[in-house]
């Protein structure tokens, strides 16, 4: 048992050494406030027009999502949003509909990212990594996005990359 634990520890150490946290720069170019939300990292916060904020996402994060909520009103962390609402919570633990989603998996020698409108479309979005293709979604029919679960719209990016999400580019 000690040998398998040592091998597992060594494999985890090698994986961790090759991957580091990613910084997601989120910019709101809309003429109104957007309330970005993220799972499993990012929670939720207010982002006024023309403001930017960073979220640090640890290596090994898979099935991550970031989206913008609109028409929100919160009081002590509870409230509602016209689009992208997540059960009335400021800090989200699930994604809400409709919402244009930036999806990602971070870690190892490659990261993966995409835009999805499977759950609906609510905001124009650009999503890019520092070493990959810039994805653009301006309307519900955007060609860079997943529209159905079987679409092929995932892109690879070098590991240890950083990301930019822009609402209303």
From Swiss-Prot:
SUPFAM superfamilies per the UniProt record, alphabetical: Osmotin, thaumatin-like protein (SSF49870)
GO biological process, one term: defense response to fungus
Pfam families hit by this protein: Thaumatin (PF00314)
Cited Gene3D superfamilies: Thaumatin (2.60.110.10)
Key words of the record: Antimicrobial, Fungicide, Pathogenesis-related protein, Plant defense, Signal
Sequence intervals crossing the membrane: none
InterPro entries noted in UniProt: Osmotin/thaumatin-like_sf, Thaumatin, Thaumatin_CS
Signal peptide: 1-21
UniProt superkingdom: Eukaryota
Family: Belongs to the thaumatin family.
Main function: Associated with resistance against stem rust fungi.
Protein name: Thaumatin-like pathogenesis-related protein 3
Gene symbol of the encoding locus: RASTL-3
